[in-house]
Swiss-Prot record:
This is Protein nucleotidyltransferase YdiU. Keywords: ATP-binding, Magnesium, Manganese, Metal-binding, Nucleotide-binding, Nucleotidyltransferase, Transferase. It comes from Bacillus cereus (strain ZK / E33L). One of its GO terms (molecular function) is AMPylase activity. It is an enzyme of class 2 (transferase). PANTHER family: PROTEIN ADENYLYLTRANSFERASE SELO, MITOCHONDRIAL. Pfam families: SelO (PF02696). Its cofactor is Mg(2+); Mn(2+).
């Protein structure tokens, strides 16, 4: 481990202790004229960096892949993945892990350059990224962090001064992504597909040491690892559902072992409540629709369990039984987390038998009347029942009476109930049309002020402040259906 004290680099590279089949060492491809367009000050400080130093030319060169900090060990990670149900051997096709930053508190975070050039895993891709998708990842990942949802984060975005060609010519950019690690379900699939039990065991041991050291002494630590990942993903997916987040591409290579949300390509937030909501242009069958996300998470975790079978038990039948037993627990864990979250969204402290029915009735009405998901809960939180089709309906008025009497029956005061609702119902989400507005200004005009204002509003989604009002409105009904596209 080496240290550059001027900017605060303090890099280690524990991933290289794994067998070399898990990665390829390769330097980033330099770019012509990098320019820093966004730096995450608060994240930089928490990682042990000095933000003002990071704005200097020498550090911008690092974010661009034109230079490396002391202790850097750039590598592309190998992994596999089921992409829309089809298995492929994959890997970092346009990203490089330059090292793991050790923070002042001793925590370890991957520092990855996304869009840093081709790698052996690029599969005919150019290894580059466009400015729009990189800024989009910055905005959405920071919004998720503010919503208290586990996520990778964005430290910096630099433009490269070079065009990137997709459907059209676009300005190129590189995002510096920060993650607890980039170990995925697909990393374990890769190890299992190669057929080396020793390599699979090495990966599992490394993952336990890095993410779940408390289970190292467990009688069957590999079963315990599976249990921990299931627990983390059940919690994560419940949090997604509770705020109306739709990931869009829940392939196994986008499911992290740490339980963080990763890959903000075709993601979006739901406006009108609809279980079938899909935004991704490539998800033509609705595989990853809003209502399918819990089921797809269980499917992805079953692929992790399959990969672990060779090390779960020496007897294959027993290993298979262990895997099946553990996967069967996901749905209960998810349902419990989601139900607890929905109760908080409605200010329910105690438990009553009809709570499930109360929640389901509201959601059915919201779907029937195409009610805005975020704003419905926002209105209930503020107790301002606005003139909408949902709130004007006789069935809602009946439901509202039931809900109010339910609040009155619990020991906690209504004031406390509404306060809990305020802490669990965001006033603001990154509305798709407002994100696009910010990206349009930045990419076409070089005007980052629209994005800065949006980021400021999103930084405290539970504030219910006056300056957020402008960002609460859903898109105009005349707007065509929103579609998202994978940045690659």
């Amino acid at each position: 481990m080496t240290k550059n004290n001027e900017a605060g680099w303090n890099l280690d590279h524990s991933y290289t202790t794994l067998p070399q089949s898990f990665y390829t060492e390769i330097p980033p491809t330099p770019v012509s004229s990098p320019e820093l367009v966004k730096l995450n000050h608060s994240l930089a400080i928490s990682l042990g960096f000095h933000p003002e130093e990071l704005k200097k030319e020498a550090e911008i060169a690092i974010f661009a892949g034109n230079a490396l900090p002391e202790g850097a060990h750039p590598l592309a990670q190998a992994y596999a993945g089921h992409q829309f149900g089809h298995f492929n051997m994959l890997g970092d096709g346009r990203a490089l892990l330059i090292g793991e930053q050790i923070t002042p508190s001793g925590k370890r975070f991957d520092i990855q350059l996304k869009g840093s050039g081709p790698t052996p895993y690029s599969r005919r891709g150019d290894g580059r990224a466009a400015l729009g998708p990189m800024l989009r990842e910055y905005i959405i990942s920071e919004a998720m962090y503010a919503l208290d949802i586990p996520t990778t984060r964005s430290l910096a975005v630099v433009t490269t001064g070079e065009p990137t060609y997709r459907e059209t010519k676009l300005p190129g950019a590189i995002l510096t992504r920060v993650a607890s690690s980039h170990i995925r379900v697909g990393t374990f699939q890769y190890a299992a597909a190669r057929g080396s039990i020793e390599d699979l065991q090495s990966l599992a041991d490394y993952t336990i040491k890095r993410h779940y050291p408390e289970i190292e002494a467990h009688e069957n630590r590999y079963t315990a690892l599976l249990q921990e990942v299931i627990k983390k993903q059940a919690s994560l997916i419940a949090k997604w559902q509770l705020v109306g987040f739709i990931h869009g591409v829940m392939n196994t290579d986008n499911i992290t072992i740490s339980g963080e949300t990763i890959d903000y390509g075709p993601c979006a937030f739901m406006d009108n409540y609809d279980q079938g909501t899909v935004f991704s242009s490539i998800d033509t069958q609705g595989r990853y629709a809003y209502g399918n996300q819990p089921y797809m998470a269980a499917w992805d975790l079953a692929r992790l369990a399959e990969s672990l079978i060779p090390i779960l038990h020496e007897d294959e039948e027993e290993a298979l039984k262990i895997a099946q037993d553990e996967i069967s627990k996901f749905s209960v864990q998810y349902e419990n987390q989601w139900f607890l979250g929905m109760k908080k969204k409605l200010g329910l402290f105690s438990n009553e038998e009809q709570d499930q029915s109360l929640i389901e009735q509201l959601l059915k009405m919201m779907e029937k009347f195409k009610a805005d998901y975020t704003n419905t809960f926002r209105s209930l939180t503020l107790n301002t029942i606005e003139n909408t089709a949902l709130f004007e309906s006789p069935e809602f008025k009946e439901w509202y009476k039931l809900w109010q009497s339910r609040l009155e029956r619990q020991e906690e005061s209504k004031e406390n109930a509404y306060e809990m609702m305020k802490n669990n119902n965001p006033s603001i989400i990154p509305r798709n049309h407002r994100v696009e507005e910010a990206l349009e200004a930045a990419v076409t005009s070089g005007d980052y002020s629209v994005m800065e204002k949006l980021l400021e509003a999103l930084s405290n989604p539970y504030a219910y402040s006056a300056d957020q009002e402008d960002y609460c409105a859903p898109p105009a009904p005349t707007n065509r259906p929103y579609r998202t596209f994978c940045g690659t």
